[in-house]
Amino acid sequence: MELKHFIHELCLNPRHTKWIAPLLVIGDAFLCALIIWKIPYTEIDWTTYMQQIALYISGERDYTLIKGSTGPLVYPAAHVYSYMALYHLTDEGRDILFGQILFAVLYLVTLAVVMVCYRQSGAPPYLFPLLVLSKRLHSVFVLRLFNDGLAVCAMWIAILLFQNKKWTAGVTAWTVGVGIKMTLLLLAPAIAVVTVLSLSLVPSIRLGILALLIQVLLAIPFLQGNPIGYVARAFELTRQFMFKWTVNWRFVGEDLFLSKQFSLALLGLHIFLLGLFVTTGWLRPSGSNVPDFLRSLLQGRQRTVVLSKSFIMTVMLTSLAIGLLCARSLHYQFFAYLSWATPCLLWRARLHPILIYAIWALQEWAWNVYPSTNASSSVVVFSLAVQVFGVLLNSRNALSDAPPRRKGKEHIQ
């Protein structure tokens, strides 16, 4: 009986995460070293990044003329500056081993930040092993050296800062992340909601202006060279994705995947889901319905509220998951954004721990199938749908201050 109580306590009591988390990070550091030692580096975009940076260093500032062996430069300015630093640190990209070590450090730093966010949200210890077990996530960071690792680090730093009400610093970290890869724009609706609830309308607008100004400052060298070319390349929202690389919607068939109607349907679903979350859960801390909230907001009578750390993290990750669910094409590196979000979202959806582990494992399997199949892509969409609709259907509990409870069981505080 005492053993059963000890295991129950160890798995469910959040206070144990203060020693479980550091042990997992240390263990993962050894795992990263083993991966770098035993598994060959995979060349995908690193050489192209370095070729593009070489052109930038040589003086080229026209984004439309910065290209590499696998294509043109399609990421914003902060990506260029980040990889310029890596260019110099890795002997112009030739010392790939050192680059892998740097990305392993980046991975571990991000993991530590993620675990702090989880601890501040009161997450139970049984979730934490899921944060270090992903094969695909390790691959994205230490075997492929994708820029998504840098963007994900900025995203989680921003979430941590938002949890601690460091709004200006949080927006700065987030917009720098957007400047690396615009995938982080998926968090914009959540940031708007939490800042308006916490600060009211005018301070939120100021933060939005700050984010925009930082983007302009980062882009000045390129805006002086070819402003239209920079915006069109770095923030291209109409890019056509190739069906053969898609991880999520392969099962719908190529004709439907490439159709404009499908793209518009996903956009409509994205907007609908965001609106549904706003009306059913995200505005609940204000204590008013949407019309009353908007009326008070526009009249300057809105009362600010103190948001819990768990609420802020859940809203941020839900906004991300909605965007990924409604994205027309996800590539393998996009798993970097989702992997660390999934355990939290499944937990906030009040799923049983066994079910959480099962869905996590299914999702991990699907993202490791290469090339994707109808079955794997169906699982990718299904697992995302479980996370989004699980939180939606349990929004009263998922977006509350208290940890989720399962019937007949209680998380020990």
From Swiss-Prot:
<comment type="pathway">
    <text>Protein modification; protein glycosylation.</text>
</comment>
<feature type="transmembrane region" description="Helical">
    <location>
        <begin position="19"/>
        <end position="39"/>
    </location>
</feature>
<feature type="topological domain" description="Lumenal">
    <location>
        <begin position="1"/>
        <end position="18"/>
    </location>
</feature>
<feature type="topological domain" description="Cytoplasmic">
    <location>
        <begin position="229"/>
        <end position="261"/>
    </location>
</feature>
<feature type="transmembrane region" description="Helical">
    <location>
        <begin position="140"/>
        <end position="160"/>
    </location>
</feature>
<feature type="topological domain" description="Lumenal">
    <location>
        <begin position="394"/>
        <end position="413"/>
    </location>
</feature>
<keyword id="KW-0256">Endoplasmic reticulum</keyword>
<comment type="function">
    <text>Dol-P-Man:Man(5)GlcNAc(2)-PP-Dol alpha-1,3-mannosyltransferase that operates in the biosynthetic pathway of dolichol-linked oligosaccharides, the glycan precursors employed in protein asparagine (N)-glycosylation. The assembly of dolichol-linked oligosaccharides begins on the cytosolic side of the endoplasmic reticulum membrane and finishes in its lumen. The sequential addition of sugars to dolichol pyrophosphate produces dolichol-linked oligosaccharides containing fourteen sugars, including two GlcNAcs, nine mannoses and three glucoses.</text>
</comment>
<dbReference type="InterPro" id="IPR007873">
    <property type="entry name" value="Glycosyltransferase_ALG3"/>
</dbReference>
<comment type="similarity">
    <text>Belongs to the glycosyltransferase ALG3 family.</text>
</comment>
<feature type="transmembrane region" description="Helical">
    <location>
        <begin position="208"/>
        <end position="228"/>
    </location>
</feature>
<feature type="topological domain" description="Lumenal">
    <location>
        <begin position="203"/>
        <end position="207"/>
    </location>
</feature>
<dbReference type="GO" id="GO:0052925">
    <property type="term" value="F:dol-P-Man:Man(5)GlcNAc(2)-PP-Dol alpha-1,3-mannosyltransferase activity"/>
</dbReference>
<protein>
    <recommendedName>
        <fullName>Dol-P-Man:Man(5)GlcNAc(2)-PP-Dol alpha-1,3-mannosyltransferase</fullName>
        <ecNumber>2.4.1.258</ecNumber>
    </recommendedName>
</protein>
<dbReference type="GO" id="GO:0005789">
    <property type="term" value="C:endoplasmic reticulum membrane"/>
</dbReference>
<keyword id="KW-1133">Transmembrane helix</keyword>
<feature type="transmembrane region" description="Helical">
    <location>
        <begin position="305"/>
        <end position="325"/>
    </location>
</feature>
<keyword id="KW-0328">Glycosyltransferase</keyword>
<feature type="transmembrane region" description="Helical">
    <location>
        <begin position="262"/>
        <end position="282"/>
    </location>
</feature>
<keyword id="KW-0472">Membrane</keyword>
<feature type="topological domain" description="Cytoplasmic">
    <location>
        <begin position="40"/>
        <end position="95"/>
    </location>
</feature>
<feature type="topological domain" description="Cytoplasmic">
    <location>
        <begin position="161"/>
        <end position="181"/>
    </location>
</feature>
<dbReference type="GO" id="GO:0006488">
    <property type="term" value="P:dolichol-linked oligosaccharide biosynthetic process"/>
</dbReference>
<feature type="transmembrane region" description="Helical">
    <location>
        <begin position="182"/>
        <end position="202"/>
    </location>
</feature>
<keyword id="KW-0812">Transmembrane</keyword>
<feature type="transmembrane region" description="Helical">
    <location>
        <begin position="96"/>
        <end position="116"/>
    </location>
</feature>
<feature type="transmembrane region" description="Helical">
    <location>
        <begin position="373"/>
        <end position="393"/>
    </location>
</feature>
<feature type="topological domain" description="Cytoplasmic">
    <location>
        <begin position="326"/>
        <end position="372"/>
    </location>
</feature>
<feature type="topological domain" description="Lumenal">
    <location>
        <begin position="117"/>
        <end position="139"/>
    </location>
</feature>
<feature type="topological domain" description="Lumenal">
    <location>
        <begin position="283"/>
        <end position="304"/>
    </location>
</feature>
<dbReference type="Pfam" id="PF05208">
    <property type="entry name" value="ALG3"/>
</dbReference>
<keyword id="KW-0808">Transferase</keyword>
